[in-house]
C-alpha cells in the first residue's frame, strides 16, 4: 500500500499498489489536487479551473507558484503516455501556468513558448523521444519541450550563467535532437536524419517544427524540394501564427506579414470548403474506425484539390503530403492527426499545417503589441516588465537616430532588415520613412543582394543585420557586393558577446570575415558618439562597400554630435586618446573603454600607457601603428572578436614592415578560440579574459612584473 495526500482530515489515504498505472496516476493527481486545495495551495495557489460551458481551462495568474498536480507527475515524456485527452488538456494548462510563473522570474522568450504548449504536449504524447527526433526551428518556443524532458527543476536557471540554454542544445539533453538559434534549418536537419535512419535500417520518426516566419527563408524551400525528391518518411509541422516578422518589427505593433507565403497560408486558413471537407473526413474516420483509411483518404484528396486552381498546394508541388489547417490549440485534434501520420506505413514527407496564437492563454501577451516575444522579469498578474532604468539609450537606438538624420538630409538613404525591425532599430526608421524601409522576411541572402541591386541604381542602402545573422548571407556579401564594389552599408548589430542568447547569437566573427574582403571598409566605434560619426562616414562612402559593428547594450554617456547628426570621419585614420610611454594599448571598438580603464589601473603601478582608438580595421591606420610600434616597448591590441580579426591585421602589417624584427613586444587580446556559453555579459568577459584587469595584468607580465600581474589576474 502507498500513502497519498488526501482531502480528508488525516490528509492521507491508501492507494493499492496493485492498481494499474493509468488509474494509479489519476488517483495520485486527484489526491495531489485535493491536498493543494486543502492547504491553501501548498507550494502554489490553486489558479486553474475548467469552465463547464466551454470546457476550456481558465488560468488566474498571480505571483505565487501555481499548483500543478498533474505536471508534478511528469518528469519525462514516458510519464505522459497513458494520459487521456482531458488529462493532456489539464497538463497543457498547468504547463502554461508554469511557463508564465518561471519566465516572470527569469526573463526569456515567452510568447512563442505559450503558443506551442498543446503542440509540445501532443508531440511528446504520441512520439517517443529521444528515439524519435523532434527538431525545433529557431528554438524560441522550446520551453515546454524542456520542461517535459527532465529539465523542469532547472528552468529557473534558463539563459543564466551555467544554467539551461535558451535554445535546444544537443549536449544539454538527449531529447534535443538538433541545436537551434538561427532560423529555417530544421527541415534540412530533419531530412538528413531521416535519410540516415533509412540507411542505417532504423524505424524511428523524425519531426521538424517550423514557424511561418522561418518559412520565408530560402533554405526551408531548398530542404522541402529535396525532401520531395528523396521521399524519406518525415513530418514537417508548420506552426502558422501569422508572425512572418518578429512582432517588434514596427513601433505600431506587429508588422504586416511579409511575402506571398503569408497570403497563401491565409487562403488555406480561410478556405471554408477545405474546412468543411476536413470535418467530413474526420467524421467518416470516427464512424467507421479502422476501415476509414480509404474513404477518408478519398475525401482528403478531394479537399486538397480544392486548395488552388491547379489542384494542389505549394507544398504538394514540392512533394509533401499536406494536412491542414489544424487547430494548433486542440490537443484532441493534434493527437489524432499525429497518430494517423505515425501509423501510415510509407507516407514520405508529410506537412501538417497548424494554426496557433503567439502568447496563447496569457492575456497580457495576447494584448501586447509585441506579444511579449522576449521579456525581462515581469509581474505575472499584469504583464508589466521590470525594465531597469538607464540614463543612456541602447547602441541600436543611437544607430537608428543617426540613420534617420542621414535620411532626412539625403532621400537616397534606405534601410533593409530581415524580419528584425525592432532588433535592429529600423522600426524607428520605418516610422519616419515607411516607404524607404524594407522588411524582406527572414532572408539574409536576399537582403544582401536586394541591397546590392538598390546600390547599383544609385540609392544608399543600409543593410541592418545582427553580426551572427549576416553569416547566413556571406556569399552574397562577397560575390554580389564586394566583388562589384557596390556601396552597400552593413550595420552589424549585436557584435561581440551577447549575454543570455549565447553562442548562437554571439557576434564574434564579423571582423574576420569582413576585413578579409579586398574592397570593404571595416569600422568599429568606441562609443555611441563614434557610432553616429560612422553612420555618417558610411553614408559618405559611395565608391565601395562599408560596414560598422556595434554591441548589444547601452551607450556610455558620450557627448553626442549636435542634432544627433554625425560627421564623416577620415577613412583609415585612428586617434590617440591618452599619451604615455613604454606601453601602448590599441583598442578596437568598445574595447577602447576597457583599455582606458586598464590605463587607470596601471597608474597605481607607476605605469603610464598610451591608449589609441583604431577606429578602422580596414584600411588600417598604418601611420598610427608604425608610430606606436616605434615609440613603445610593448604594443597590445584589444578587441571583442575572434582570432583572425583586428589583431591579426595589425600583426600582419608589422611583420611585413619589419617592425617585429626589433625589440617590440606585440600581444593580441581577443576572444578565445572556442564558443562561450550564455550568461551574464560580465561573466562572459571574465571568461574571455577581456576585462580591464586582464589587460593590465598582460601589460605587467610583458614588463617583467609577473607577481603584480598574478595579483591582478
Swiss-Prot record:
One of its GO terms (molecular function) is 1-deoxy-D-xylulose-5-phosphate synthase activity. SUPFAM superfamilies: Thiamin diphosphate-binding fold (THDP-binding), TK C-terminal domain-like. Keywords: Chloroplast, Isoprene biosynthesis, Magnesium, Metal-binding, Plastid, Thiamine biosynthesis, Thiamine pyrophosphate, Transferase, Transit peptide. It catalyses: D-glyceraldehyde 3-phosphate + pyruvate + H(+) = 1-deoxy-D-xylulose 5-phosphate + CO2. The lineage of its organism: Eukaryota, Viridiplantae, Streptophyta, Embryophyta, Tracheophyta. HAMAP family: DXP_synth. It comes from Oryza sativa subsp. japonica (Rice). Pfam families: DXP_synthase_N (PF13292), Transket_pyr (PF02779), Transketolase_C (PF02780). This is Probable 1-deoxy-D-xylulose-5-phosphate synthase 2, chloroplastic. Residues 1-30 form a transit peptide.
Amino acid at each position: 500500500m502507498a500513502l497519498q495526500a488526501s482531502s480528508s482530515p488525516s490528509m492521507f489515504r491508501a492507494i493499492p499498489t496493485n492498481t494499474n498505472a493509468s488509474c494509479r496516476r489519476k488517483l495520485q493527481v486527484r489526491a495531489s489536487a485535493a491536498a493543494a486545495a486543502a492547504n491553501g495551495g501548498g507550494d502554489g495557489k490553486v489558479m486553474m479551473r475548467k469552465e463547464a460551458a466551454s470546457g476550456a481551462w481558465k488560468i488566474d495568474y498571480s505571483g505565487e507558484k501555481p499548483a500543478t498536480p498533474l505536471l508534478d507527475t511528469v518528469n519525462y515524456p514516458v510519464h505522459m503516455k497513458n494520459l487521456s485527452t482531458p488529462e493532456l488538456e489539464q497538463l497543457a494548462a498547468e504547463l502554461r501556468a508554469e511557463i508564465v510563473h518561471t519566465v516572470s522570474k527569469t526573463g526569456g522568450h515567452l510568447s512563442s513558448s505559450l503558443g506551442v504548449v498543446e503542440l509540445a504536449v501532443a508531440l511528446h504524447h504520441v512520439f517517443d523521444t529521444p528515439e524519435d527526433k523532434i527538431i525545433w526551428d529557431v528554438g524560441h518556443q522550446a520551453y515546454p519541450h524542456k520542461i517535459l524532458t527532465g529539465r523542469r527543476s532547472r528552468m529557473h536557471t534558463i539563459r543564466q550563467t551555467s544554467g539551461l540554454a535558451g535554445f535546444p542544445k544537443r549536449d544539454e539533453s538527449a531529447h534535443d535532437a538538433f541545436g537551434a538559434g538561427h532560423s529555417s534549418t530544421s527541415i534540412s536537419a530533419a531530412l538528413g536524419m531521416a535519410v540516415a535512419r533509412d540507411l542505417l535500417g532504423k524505424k524511428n520518426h523524425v519531426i521538424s517544427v517550423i514557424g511561418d516566419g522561418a518559412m520565408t527563408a530560402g533554405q526551408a524551400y531548398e530542404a522541402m524540394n529535396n525532401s520531395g525528391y528523396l521521399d524519406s518518411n518525415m513530418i514537417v509541422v508548420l506552426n502558422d501564427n501569422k508572425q512572418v516578422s518578429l512582432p517588434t518589427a514596427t513601433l505600431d505593433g506587429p508588422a504586416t506579414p511579409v511575402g506571398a507565403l503569408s497570403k497563401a497560408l491565409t487562403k488555406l486558413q480561410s478556405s471554408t470548403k477545405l474546412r468543411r471537407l476536413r470535418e467530413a473526413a474526420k467524421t467518416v474516420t470516427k464512424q467507421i474506425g479502422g476501415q476509414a483509411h480509404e474513404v477518408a483518404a478519398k475525401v482528403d484528396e478531394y479537399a486538397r484539390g480544392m486548395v488552388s486552381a491547379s489542384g494542389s498546394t505549394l507544398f504538394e508541388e514540392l512533394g509533401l503530403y499536406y494536412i491542414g489547417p489544424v487547430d494548433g490549440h486542440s490537443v484532441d485534434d493534434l493527437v489524432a492527426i499525429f497518430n494517423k501520420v505515425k501509423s501510415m506505413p510509407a507516407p514520405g514527407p508529410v506537412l501538417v499545417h497548424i494554426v496557433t496564437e503567439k502568447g496563447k492563454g496569457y492575456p497580457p501577451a495576447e494584448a501586447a503589441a509585441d506579444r511579449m516575444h522576449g521579456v525581462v522579469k515581469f509581474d505575472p498578474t499584469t504583464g508589466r516588465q521590470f525594465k531597469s532604468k538607464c540614463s543612456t539609450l541602447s547602441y541600436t537606438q543611437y544607430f537608428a537616430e543617426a540613420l534617420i538624420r542621414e535620411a532626412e538630409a539625403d532621400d537616397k538613404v534606405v534601410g533593409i532588415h530581415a524580419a528584425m525591425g525592432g532588433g535592429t532599430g529600423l522600426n524607428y526608421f520605418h516610422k519616419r520613412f515607411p516607404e524607404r524601409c524594407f522588411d524582406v522576411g527572414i532572408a539574409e541572402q536576399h537582403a544582401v543582394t536586394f541591397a546590392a541591386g538598390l546600390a547599383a541604381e544609385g540609392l544608399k542602402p543600409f543593410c541592418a543585420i545582427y553580426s551572427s545573422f549576416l553569416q547566413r548571407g556571406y556569399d552574397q556579401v562577397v560575390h554580389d557586393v564586394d566583388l562589384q564594389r557596390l556601396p552597400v552599408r552593413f550595420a552589424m548589430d549585436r557584435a561581440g558577446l551577447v549575454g543570455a542568447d549565447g553562442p548562437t547569437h554571439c557576434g564574434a566573427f564579423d571582423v574576420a570575415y569582413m576585413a578579409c574582403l579586398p574592397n570593404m571598409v571595416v569600422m568599429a566605434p568606441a562609443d555611441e558618439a563614434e557610432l553616429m560619426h560612422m553612420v555618417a562616414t558610411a553614408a559618405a562612402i559611395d565608391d565601395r562597400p562599408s560596414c560598422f559593428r556595434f554591441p548589444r547594450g547601452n551607450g556610455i554617456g558620450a557627448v553626442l554630435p549636435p542634432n544627433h547628426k554625425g560627421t564623416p570621419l577620415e577613412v583609415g585614420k585612428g586617434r590617440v586618446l591618452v599619451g604615455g610611454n613604454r606601453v601602448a594599448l590599441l583598442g578596437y571598438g568598445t574595447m577602447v573603454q576597457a583599455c582606458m580603464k586598464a590605463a587607470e589601473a596601471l597608474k597605481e603601478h607607476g605605469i603610464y600607457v598610451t591608449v589609441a582608438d583604431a577606429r578602422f580595421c580596414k584600411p588600417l591606420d598604418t601611420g598610427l601603428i608604425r608610430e606606436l610600434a616605434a615609440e613603445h616597448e610593448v604594443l597590445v591590441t584589444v578587441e571583442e572578436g575572434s582570432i583572425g580579426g583586428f589583431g591579426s591585421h595589425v600583426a600582419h602589417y608589422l611583420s611585413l614592415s619589419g617592425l617585429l624584427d626589433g625589440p617590440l613586444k606585440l600581444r593580441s587580446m581577443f576572444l578565445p578560440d572556442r564558443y562561450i556559453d550564455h550568461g551574464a555579459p560580465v561573466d562572459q568577459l571574465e571568461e574571455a579574459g577581456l576585462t580591464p584587469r586582464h589587460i593590465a595584468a598582460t601589460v605587467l607580465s610583458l614588463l617583467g612584473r609577473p607577481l603584480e600581474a598574478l595579483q591582478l589576474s
